[in-house]
Amino acid sequence: MQVIFLNDVRGKGKRGQIKNVPDGYAQNFLIKKGLAKEATKAAINTLKAEQKSEAARAAEELAEAKQVKTVLEADETVVELKAKAGTDGRLFGSIPSKQIATALADQYQVKLDKRKIELPEPIRVLGYTNVPVKLHPEVTAKIRVHVVEK
């Protein structure tokens, strides 16, 4: 019997996959537990339409991430932050990714989740720092952060 998997089933199939399985296994376990449904023509067509729309949405997200990358990596894009510092150029405290995300939204109207800013450790010195930003699993940008004394 052909079934469409609704969830991942270990050792049998992944979500959205169409596979042949024994009739008893399909009816008594997979379909009964809601892990799969029978692969009728209508169900297969619905699945293909869903996969097509998912692919289009993923392509749109990728294009949007690339557009944001061009804005962030432009030469004139420098995120300015002010902080108190000592005489040796070290900050009193630090600048975390949340503060960078807030400044980016204020200065360039680019809203980013602070978790996308891959700051290995908070910035603790004055000057310019290149900070990687993971916009999409396939797109990573670098933004320049300039920390000046208050």
UniProtKB/Swiss-Prot annotation:
Chain's role: Binds to the 23S rRNA.
Name the record gives this protein: Large ribosomal subunit protein bL9
UniProt similarity note: Belongs to the bacterial ribosomal protein bL9 family.
UniProt cross-references to InterPro entries, sorted A to Z: Ribosomal_bL9 (IPR000244), Ribosomal_bL9/RNase_H1_N (IPR009027), Ribosomal_bL9_bac/chp (IPR020594), Ribosomal_bL9_C (IPR020069), Ribosomal_bL9_C_sf (IPR036791), Ribosomal_bL9_N (IPR020070), Ribosomal_bL9_N_sf (IPR036935)
One Pfam family per UniProt: Ribosomal_L9_C
One GO BP annotation of this record: translation
Keyword terms, alphabetized: Ribonucleoprotein, Ribosomal protein, RNA-binding, rRNA-binding
Entry GO CC: ribonucleoprotein complex; ribosome
Family matches, as NCBIfam families: L9
Entry GO MF terms: rRNA binding; structural constituent of ribosome
